[in-house]
Amino acid sequence: MPRFFLVLLAVSQFAFTQTFTYKAINIPGATETQVRGVNSSGEIVGFYKTTSCVETNIQFPNCPVHGFKITNGVITKLLVPHSTWTDIMGVNDFGDLVGFAITTNTGAHGFLWKHQNVITYFNTPEAGPNSDIHTVAMSVNKALVVGGADWFFSDNAPVNGWVWANGMFGTMNPGGTVSGTCCWGVNGISNNGFLSGQNFYQDFDSAWFKSGTDEDFYLFNSRDTVGTGVDSNGDIIGYSTTGKGWFAKSIEANEGTNDATEVKPKFISVAFPNAKATYPFGLSDKRMIGGTYVDSNGGIHGFVATPNF
Protein backbone atom coordinates (compact mmCIF):
# COMPACT_ATOMS: atom_id res chain seq x y z
CA MET A 1 0.00 0.00 0.00
CA PRO A 2 1.57 3.33 -0.99
CA ARG A 3 2.15 5.72 1.88
CA PHE A 4 1.79 9.45 1.44
CA PHE A 5 4.02 11.46 3.70
CA LEU A 6 4.86 15.14 3.53
CA VAL A 7 7.96 16.33 5.33
CA LEU A 8 7.78 20.07 6.02
CA LEU A 9 11.36 21.20 6.39
CA ALA A 10 12.78 24.34 7.90
CA VAL A 11 15.96 25.90 6.54
CA SER A 12 17.61 25.22 9.90
CA GLN A 13 17.48 21.48 9.13
CA PHE A 14 20.08 21.89 6.40
CA ALA A 15 23.48 20.48 7.29
CA PHE A 16 25.59 23.40 6.15
CA THR A 17 28.81 21.89 7.55
CA GLN A 18 28.88 19.28 4.79
CA THR A 19 29.52 20.90 1.45
CA PHE A 20 30.37 20.31 -2.18
CA THR A 21 33.15 21.56 -4.44
CA TYR A 22 31.69 23.15 -7.57
CA LYS A 23 32.92 23.48 -11.14
CA ALA A 24 31.12 25.54 -13.81
CA ILE A 25 30.47 23.94 -17.19
CA ASN A 26 30.02 26.13 -20.28
CA ILE A 27 30.06 25.04 -23.91
CA PRO A 28 32.15 27.52 -25.97
CA GLY A 29 29.97 29.71 -28.15
CA ALA A 30 26.74 28.76 -26.39
CA THR A 31 24.28 31.32 -25.03
CA GLU A 32 23.22 28.85 -22.31
CA THR A 33 24.54 25.53 -20.99
CA GLN A 34 22.71 23.02 -18.82
CA VAL A 35 24.23 19.88 -17.27
CA ARG A 36 21.67 17.11 -16.75
CA GLY A 37 23.69 14.05 -15.81
CA VAL A 38 27.01 12.70 -14.59
CA ASN A 39 28.08 9.08 -14.18
CA SER A 40 30.52 7.29 -11.90
CA SER A 41 33.34 7.71 -14.44
CA GLY A 42 32.84 11.47 -14.45
CA GLU A 43 31.23 11.67 -17.91
CA ILE A 44 29.07 14.82 -18.03
CA VAL A 45 26.04 15.27 -20.30
CA GLY A 46 23.50 17.96 -21.04
CA PHE A 47 22.45 20.45 -23.70
CA TYR A 48 23.17 23.99 -24.84
CA LYS A 49 21.61 26.82 -26.85
CA THR A 50 23.14 28.88 -29.60
CA THR A 51 20.39 31.53 -29.74
CA SER A 52 18.49 33.48 -27.09
CA CYS A 53 15.16 32.01 -26.03
CA VAL A 54 13.19 32.18 -22.77
CA GLU A 55 12.22 28.85 -21.20
CA THR A 56 8.77 28.15 -19.77
CA ASN A 57 10.20 25.65 -17.28
CA ILE A 58 13.76 24.80 -16.24
CA GLN A 59 13.09 21.04 -16.34
CA PHE A 60 12.03 20.61 -19.96
CA PRO A 61 13.30 23.16 -22.50
CA ASN A 62 10.74 24.57 -24.90
CA CYS A 63 13.52 26.18 -26.96
CA PRO A 64 15.70 24.43 -29.59
CA VAL A 65 18.84 22.92 -28.03
CA HIS A 66 21.76 20.68 -28.97
CA GLY A 67 23.20 17.94 -26.77
CA PHE A 68 26.73 17.38 -25.53
CA LYS A 69 28.89 15.04 -23.51
CA ILE A 70 32.22 15.71 -21.84
CA THR A 71 34.56 12.75 -21.40
CA ASN A 72 38.00 13.27 -19.83
CA GLY A 73 37.68 16.98 -20.55
CA VAL A 74 36.85 16.51 -24.25
CA ILE A 75 33.57 18.07 -25.42
CA THR A 76 31.53 16.18 -28.00
CA LYS A 77 28.51 17.97 -29.46
CA LEU A 78 25.58 15.67 -30.12
CA LEU A 79 22.57 15.70 -32.42
CA VAL A 80 20.31 12.73 -33.03
CA PRO A 81 20.45 12.03 -36.81
CA HIS A 82 18.10 14.26 -38.82
CA SER A 83 17.26 16.27 -35.70
CA THR A 84 17.03 20.00 -35.24
CA TRP A 85 16.62 19.60 -31.49
CA THR A 86 18.34 17.14 -29.12
CA ASP A 87 18.03 17.25 -25.32
CA ILE A 88 20.47 14.93 -23.54
CA MET A 89 18.79 14.39 -20.16
CA GLY A 90 20.67 11.51 -18.54
CA VAL A 91 23.58 9.07 -18.71
CA ASN A 92 24.35 5.72 -17.08
CA ASP A 93 27.66 4.21 -16.01
CA PHE A 94 28.18 2.63 -19.45
CA GLY A 95 27.79 5.97 -21.23
CA ASP A 96 24.32 5.24 -22.62
CA LEU A 97 22.30 8.45 -23.08
CA VAL A 98 18.61 9.31 -22.91
CA GLY A 99 16.61 12.38 -23.82
CA PHE A 100 14.19 13.97 -26.24
CA ALA A 101 14.58 14.89 -29.90
CA ILE A 102 12.66 16.44 -32.76
CA THR A 103 13.66 15.07 -36.15
CA THR A 104 12.87 16.36 -39.61
CA ASN A 105 11.77 12.96 -40.89
CA THR A 106 9.87 11.31 -38.01
CA GLY A 107 8.89 14.09 -35.58
CA ALA A 108 9.29 14.14 -31.79
CA HIS A 109 10.46 11.17 -29.71
CA GLY A 110 12.08 10.07 -26.51
CA PHE A 111 15.27 8.14 -27.17
CA LEU A 112 17.88 5.77 -25.80
CA TRP A 113 21.29 6.35 -27.41
CA LYS A 114 23.51 3.40 -26.54
CA HIS A 115 27.25 3.86 -26.25
CA GLN A 116 27.64 1.50 -29.25
CA ASN A 117 25.95 4.32 -31.26
CA VAL A 118 22.61 2.52 -31.65
CA ILE A 119 19.56 4.76 -31.13
CA THR A 120 16.10 3.54 -30.11
CA TYR A 121 13.17 5.94 -30.36
CA PHE A 122 9.96 5.57 -28.37
CA ASN A 123 6.71 7.37 -27.58
CA THR A 124 4.12 6.68 -24.91
CA PRO A 125 0.59 5.79 -26.09
CA GLU A 126 -0.55 9.30 -25.10
CA ALA A 127 2.21 10.95 -27.12
CA GLY A 128 3.39 10.60 -30.70
CA PRO A 129 5.64 12.09 -33.37
CA ASN A 130 3.13 14.84 -34.19
CA SER A 131 1.38 15.12 -30.83
CA ASP A 132 1.37 18.14 -28.51
CA ILE A 133 2.34 15.68 -25.74
CA HIS A 134 6.04 14.81 -25.79
CA THR A 135 7.82 11.71 -24.46
CA VAL A 136 10.82 12.92 -22.46
CA ALA A 137 13.35 10.36 -21.17
CA MET A 138 14.98 11.77 -18.03
CA SER A 139 17.24 9.00 -16.68
CA VAL A 140 18.61 5.53 -17.37
CA ASN A 141 20.34 2.88 -15.27
CA LYS A 142 22.84 0.16 -16.17
CA ALA A 143 20.02 -2.31 -16.90
CA LEU A 144 18.71 0.14 -19.55
CA VAL A 145 15.56 0.87 -17.60
CA VAL A 146 14.55 4.42 -18.52
CA GLY A 147 12.56 6.81 -16.34
CA GLY A 148 10.70 9.77 -17.77
CA ALA A 149 7.49 11.70 -18.24
CA ASP A 150 5.11 13.13 -20.78
CA TRP A 151 5.27 16.91 -21.16
CA PHE A 152 3.53 19.74 -22.98
CA PHE A 153 5.92 22.50 -24.08
CA SER A 154 3.80 25.18 -22.40
CA ASP A 155 3.35 23.44 -19.02
CA ASN A 156 5.20 23.95 -15.75
CA ALA A 157 4.91 20.29 -14.74
CA PRO A 158 4.79 16.86 -16.40
CA VAL A 159 1.55 15.08 -17.24
CA ASN A 160 2.32 11.42 -16.69
CA GLY A 161 5.26 9.46 -15.27
CA TRP A 162 6.58 6.18 -16.65
CA VAL A 163 9.42 3.68 -16.89
CA TRP A 164 10.45 2.01 -20.14
CA ALA A 165 12.45 -1.19 -20.67
CA ASN A 166 12.83 -3.55 -23.63
CA GLY A 167 10.26 -1.67 -25.66
CA MET A 168 7.56 -1.72 -22.97
CA PHE A 169 6.17 1.14 -20.88
CA GLY A 170 5.04 0.87 -17.28
CA THR A 171 3.08 3.67 -15.64
CA MET A 172 4.68 4.97 -12.45
CA ASN A 173 2.20 7.52 -11.18
CA PRO A 174 2.67 7.90 -7.43
CA GLY A 175 -0.58 8.37 -5.60
CA GLY A 176 -2.60 7.30 -8.60
CA THR A 177 -5.36 5.92 -6.38
CA VAL A 178 -5.55 8.99 -4.14
CA SER A 179 -7.88 11.87 -4.94
CA GLY A 180 -6.19 15.15 -5.80
CA THR A 181 -2.94 13.83 -7.25
CA CYS A 182 -1.67 14.70 -10.72
CA CYS A 183 1.32 15.82 -12.72
CA TRP A 184 3.59 12.84 -12.14
CA GLY A 185 7.12 12.48 -13.41
CA VAL A 186 9.93 9.93 -12.99
CA ASN A 187 13.12 12.00 -13.03
CA GLY A 188 15.70 9.58 -11.64
CA ILE A 189 16.33 5.83 -11.54
CA SER A 190 19.22 4.13 -9.74
CA ASN A 191 21.10 0.99 -10.72
CA ASN A 192 19.23 -0.98 -8.06
CA GLY A 193 15.82 0.35 -9.05
CA PHE A 194 15.11 3.27 -6.71
CA LEU A 195 12.94 5.92 -8.36
CA SER A 196 12.81 9.67 -7.76
CA GLY A 197 10.45 12.23 -9.18
CA GLN A 198 7.58 14.57 -8.55
CA ASN A 199 3.82 14.90 -8.44
CA PHE A 200 1.16 17.35 -7.33
CA TYR A 201 -0.32 16.29 -4.01
CA GLN A 202 -2.25 18.12 -1.28
CA ASP A 203 -1.83 21.53 -2.94
CA PHE A 204 1.93 21.21 -3.44
CA ASP A 205 4.37 19.97 -6.04
CA SER A 206 6.05 17.23 -4.00
CA ALA A 207 9.33 15.38 -4.40
CA TRP A 208 8.74 11.64 -4.59
CA PHE A 209 10.89 8.60 -3.72
CA LYS A 210 9.99 4.97 -4.41
CA SER A 211 11.72 1.87 -3.07
CA GLY A 212 9.84 -1.33 -3.87
CA THR A 213 6.26 -0.74 -2.76
CA ASP A 214 7.20 2.10 -0.41
CA GLU A 215 6.50 5.65 -1.61
CA ASP A 216 7.48 8.81 0.28
CA PHE A 217 6.67 12.43 -0.55
CA TYR A 218 8.72 15.44 0.57
CA LEU A 219 8.47 19.20 0.68
CA PHE A 220 11.42 21.47 1.32
CA ASN A 221 10.70 24.49 3.50
CA SER A 222 6.94 24.08 2.93
CA ARG A 223 7.39 25.00 -0.72
CA ASP A 224 6.76 23.29 -4.04
CA THR A 225 9.56 20.76 -4.46
CA VAL A 226 10.92 18.65 -7.32
CA GLY A 227 12.85 15.41 -6.80
CA THR A 228 15.40 14.68 -9.52
CA GLY A 229 18.33 12.23 -9.25
CA VAL A 230 18.72 9.17 -7.04
CA ASP A 231 21.67 6.81 -6.52
CA SER A 232 22.05 3.22 -5.34
CA ASN A 233 22.67 4.39 -1.76
CA GLY A 234 19.16 5.85 -1.63
CA ASP A 235 20.57 9.39 -1.72
CA ILE A 236 18.28 11.86 -3.47
CA ILE A 237 18.64 15.34 -4.90
CA GLY A 238 16.22 18.02 -6.00
CA TYR A 239 15.19 21.62 -5.55
CA SER A 240 12.39 23.88 -4.47
CA THR A 241 10.72 25.73 -7.31
CA THR A 242 12.33 28.90 -5.93
CA GLY A 243 15.71 27.45 -6.98
CA LYS A 244 17.06 26.13 -3.67
CA GLY A 245 18.95 22.91 -4.34
CA TRP A 246 19.37 20.06 -1.86
CA PHE A 247 20.88 16.61 -1.31
CA ALA A 248 19.68 14.01 1.23
CA LYS A 249 21.66 10.95 2.32
CA SER A 250 20.31 7.39 2.31
CA ILE A 251 16.76 8.30 3.23
CA GLU A 252 15.43 4.73 3.38
CA ALA A 253 18.36 3.48 5.48
CA ASN A 254 17.56 6.16 8.04
CA GLU A 255 14.17 4.53 8.68
CA GLY A 256 15.64 1.29 10.00
CA THR A 257 13.55 -1.86 9.66
CA ASN A 258 10.24 -0.32 10.71
CA ASP A 259 8.61 1.02 7.56
CA ALA A 260 5.74 2.39 9.61
CA THR A 261 8.10 4.98 11.10
CA GLU A 262 9.36 7.75 8.87
CA VAL A 263 12.54 9.65 9.66
CA LYS A 264 12.94 13.15 8.28
CA PRO A 265 15.87 13.15 5.87
CA LYS A 266 18.81 15.38 6.70
CA PHE A 267 19.24 17.82 3.87
CA ILE A 268 22.53 19.31 2.66
CA SER A 269 22.48 22.54 0.69
CA VAL A 270 23.43 22.39 -2.99
CA ALA A 271 24.11 26.00 -3.97
CA PHE A 272 26.58 27.10 -6.63
CA PRO A 273 28.64 30.01 -5.18
CA ASN A 274 26.98 33.42 -5.67
CA ALA A 275 24.21 31.95 -7.83
CA LYS A 276 20.63 33.24 -7.77
CA ALA A 277 19.28 29.69 -8.17
CA THR A 278 20.71 26.16 -8.27
CA TYR A 279 19.01 23.13 -9.83
CA PRO A 280 20.60 19.70 -9.21
CA PHE A 281 19.47 17.19 -11.85
CA GLY A 282 21.74 14.13 -12.06
CA LEU A 283 23.40 12.05 -9.33
CA SER A 284 26.05 9.33 -9.71
CA ASP A 285 26.74 6.43 -7.36
CA LYS A 286 29.84 8.38 -6.26
CA ARG A 287 27.51 11.20 -5.15
CA MET A 288 28.68 13.56 -7.88
CA ILE A 289 25.94 15.96 -8.94
CA GLY A 290 25.30 17.46 -12.35
CA GLY A 291 23.04 20.48 -12.59
CA THR A 292 22.29 24.01 -13.66
CA TYR A 293 22.64 27.38 -11.98
CA VAL A 294 21.46 30.92 -12.69
CA ASP A 295 24.03 33.68 -12.17
CA SER A 296 23.42 37.18 -10.79
CA ASN A 297 22.72 38.50 -14.30
CA GLY A 298 20.24 35.76 -15.17
CA GLY A 299 22.69 33.73 -17.26
CA ILE A 300 22.24 29.95 -17.20
CA HIS A 301 25.23 27.63 -16.80
CA GLY A 302 25.96 24.00 -16.06
CA PHE A 303 27.91 22.69 -13.09
CA VAL A 304 29.23 19.55 -11.46
CA ALA A 305 29.55 19.23 -7.69
CA THR A 306 31.84 16.79 -5.87
CA PRO A 307 31.00 15.95 -2.23
CA ASN A 308 33.43 16.80 0.56
CA PHE A 309 32.11 14.00 2.77
Located regions from the model:
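N-terminal signal peptide c-region/cleavage motif recognized by signal peptidases
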Residues: S12-F14
